A protein has these predicted regions:
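Transmembrane helix irregularities
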Residues: 34-42, 145-148, 187-188
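Long extracytoplasmic/lumenal interhelical loops at the membrane interface
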Residues: 93-148
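Membrane-interface catalytic loops of GT-C/OST-like multi-pass glycosylation enzymes that act
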Residues: 40-44, 136, 189-200
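Hydrophobic alpha-helical segments of polytopic membrane proteins
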Residues: 14-86, 165-166, 173, 181
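Single conserved hydrophobic/aromatic residue that forms the stacking wall/gate
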Residues: 1-6, 10-13
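Juxtamembrane "helix-exit" motif on the non-cytosolic side of transmembrane helices
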Residues: 87-91
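Transmembrane alpha-helices of multi-pass inner-membrane enzymes
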Residues: 178-183, 194-219
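A conserved mid-to-late transmembrane alpha helix and its immediate loop/hinge
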Residues: 133-165, 184
Length: 219
C-alpha cells in the first residue's frame, strides 16, 4: 500500500508541476527512483516512473497535434494487450513466457482463470468467481472484465476512450500523459480503477459537464 501511495503521489506531483518540469527535475527524481529501486526491487514502480518521463518528453518535444494523437491510444493498447495475453498465453511460447516472467506471473494467473471459468457477458458474484482461486488478478483491465463481465468492461473503456478523445480535442495533453502513465500501471496493478487512488478517473465527468472544463481550459 505504501508503494502504491508513493507512486500515485509522484504522478500527481508531476501533474501539478507539469509546466515547471525540466532536465534537472528529471535527473534528480530519476536518481531518487533508482535508489528506491535498489532498496525495494520494485520493477513496476520504476518502469512506470520512467515511462511517465518518456511521455512527458514526447509531449514537450513534439509540436504536431496529429502525432500527439497517439496519446489517446494508451488505454486501448493496454486493454488489447491484457486481453490478448490472457486468451493466448502459452508457457512454451518464448515471447509470452518472457512477458509473463517480466510481470511476475500475472499473465499465467489471468490465463488460468480464463481456462477455468471463461469470460461472462454479465457480472458474477464473488462466491461464483472464487469457487476456484488461482491468485490475485493484478491487472485493472482484466479485473473489471472477469468481475464485472464483458458488457460492463466495454462500457467502462468506451467512456474512458471518449473522455480521452475529448481531452485531445481540447489539447489537454498533460492529462493524456498522466492517463497514459496509468494505462501502463493498469497492466501491472489493479488499483487504477480505484477513484481514491486514481483521481484522473474523475475526468470522465467532462462527458456530463463539458462546458465547465472547456471554459476553464480557455482561461
Amino acid at each position: 500500500t505504501t508503494r502504491l501511495v508513493g507512486s500515485e503521489m509522484c504522478i500527481r506531483d508531476r501533474y501539478y508541476n507539469y509546466e515547471k518540469l525540466n532536465v534537472l527535475w528529471c535527473g534528480v527524481t530519476s536518481l531518487i527512483a533508482l535508489v528506491f529501486y535498489k532498496m525495494t526491487f520494485c520493477r513496476t514502480g520504476v518502469l512506470v516512473f520512467f515511462f511517465c518521463w518518456v511521455l512527458i518528453l514526447f509531449d514537450k518535444v513534439v509540436k504536431s497535434k496529429n502525432i500527439k494523437s497517439v496519446l489517446v491510444c494508451s488505454v486501448p493498447v493496454g486493454a488489447a494487450f491484457s486481453l490478448f495475453t490472457t486468451l493466448f498465453y502459452n508457457g512454451n511460447h518464448a515471447l509470452l513466457y518472457k512477458i509473463n516472467h517480466l510481470v511476475s506471473g500475472r499473465v499465467y494467473i489471468m490465463n488460468t482463470y480464463y481456462k477455468d471459468q471463461g469470460l461472462s457477458l454479465f457480472p458474477r458474484t464473488q462466491e461464483i468467481f472464487y469457487t476456484s482461486y488461482h491468485g490475485l488478478i493484478d491487472n485493472s483491465y482484466m479485473q473489471v472484465t472477469f468481475y464485472a463481465g464483458i458488457l460492463v468492461a466495454v462500457l467502462f473503456f468506451v467512456i474512458i476512450l471518449k473522455t480521452m478523445l475529448r481531452l485531445y480535442r481540447m489539447e489537454c495533453y498533460k492529462e493524456l500523459v498522466m492517463i497514459g502513465t496509468l494505462a501502463l500501471y493498469g497492466v501491472l496493478e489493479q488499483f487504477v480503477l480505484n477513484g481514491f487512488m486514481n483521481i484522473f478517473l474523475l475526468l470522465c465527468g467532462i462527458l456530463l459537464y463539458p462546458g465547465i472544463v472547456e471554459e476553464k481550459h480557455e482561461k
